């Protein structure tokens, strides 16, 4: 029953994500392994949005290791457990909590033993900066711990890159790229070698702009209409000055109309925004507000159209709310 509910929830979240984003591009599906333990290692740029995208756009039905700090909100906590997320505690969460990680790792070993998939965001935290930060050792500990406990298993690491045209805006583009798998076929003494292999694989599939002159580079890319989610387009422009697939200029009118016809949802975000201390969570809260309240809002408009004197006015407003939501588009940033 729980698996059925999880499947239904993932379907609803997937539909909602396609309503929130203008375009979701998935590359490298042919690299998804079958019938073996998979440790999926991804970069982390957009808080809860990242795991939601991976939960809904891979057939692997993965479990997630997520920093324990996001489990504090009761509603979010229930949602996280329902979509197969497990907490990872760090020193900043308190030394006494670190011991709870062993229980989490034991749970992941059981998932992997059954040829399941576990996702870990190896950078350890999220950041909107478009480059790869140093990887933590959590995924190597998991891989070698699994091999020690179940020597007969043949786990692989699947690198995944996630890139956004505008991290904090709806109506933007997101690109998910699955890289080639990396076998865990070395002794634990070579964990550093495994880390470097995964780091190299991730850098090969994500937009990785050096810290030096970072802001100036981003500004140039946006001014020349380069797709910020495409590693190939970004590298082509930086090397040759050519723009293979310009994204065009977005005037923002569609976004303004969406806010007008979906004003109750936008107003709730304006109320919530001052309490969001970490701006990277902005997109997460916008999505959660839409996911939980958009359908009730549309049913309210439908009721106005069907059962009140407003009649055709209510129906017109409902149609415009839907249309402007699906036509919503924001510029890159």
Region annotations inferred by a language model:
Residues 1-39, 52, 58, 231-255, ...:
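Membrane-anchoring hydrophobic helices of lipid-metabolizing enzymes
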Residues 5, 32-97, 270-277:
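Catalytic core of membrane glycerolipid acyltransferases/transacylases, capturing the structured
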């Amino acid at each position: 029953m729980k698996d059925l509910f999880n499947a239904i929830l993932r379907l609803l979240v997937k539909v909602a994500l396609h309503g929130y984003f203008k375009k979701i591009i998935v590359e490298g599906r042919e690299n998804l392994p079958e019938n073996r333990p998979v440790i999926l290692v991804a970069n982390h740029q957009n808080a809860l949005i990242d795991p939601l995208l991976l939960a809904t756009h891979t057939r692997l039905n993965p479990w997630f290791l997520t920093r324990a700090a996001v489990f504090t909100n009761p509603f979010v906590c229930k949602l996280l457990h329902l979509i197969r997320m497990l907490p990872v505690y760090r020193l900043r969460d308190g030394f006494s909590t670190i011991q709870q990680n062993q229980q989490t790792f034991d749970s992941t070993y059981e998932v992997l033993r059954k040829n399941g998939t576990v996702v870990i965001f190896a950078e350890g935290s999220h950041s909107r900066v478009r480059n790869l930060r140093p990887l933590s050792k959590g995924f190597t500990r998991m891989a070698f711990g699994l091999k020690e406990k179940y020597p007969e298993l043949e786990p692989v690491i699947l690198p995944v890159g996630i890139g956004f045209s505008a991290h904090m805006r709806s109506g933007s583009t997101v690109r998910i790229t699955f890289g080639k798998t990396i076998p865990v076929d070395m002794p634990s003494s070579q964990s550093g070698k495994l880390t470097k292999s995964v780091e190299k694989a991730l850098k090969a599939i994500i937009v990785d702009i050096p810290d030096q002159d970072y802001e100036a580079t981003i500004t140039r890319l946006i001014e020349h209409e380069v797709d910020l989610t495409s590693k190939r387009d970004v590298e082509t422009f930086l090397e040759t000055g050519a723009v293979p697939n310009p994204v065009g200029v977005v005037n923002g009118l569609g976004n303004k109309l969406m806010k007008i016809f979906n004003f109750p949802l936008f107003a709730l975000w304006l109320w919530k925004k001052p309490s969001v201390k970490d701006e990277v969570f902005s997109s997460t809260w916008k999505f959660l507000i839409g996911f939980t309240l958009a359908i009730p809002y549309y049913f309210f408009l439908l009721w106005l159209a069907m059962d009140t004197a407003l009649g055709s006015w209510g129906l017109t407003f409902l149609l415009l709310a839907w249309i402007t939501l699906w036509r919503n588009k924001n510029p890159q940033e």
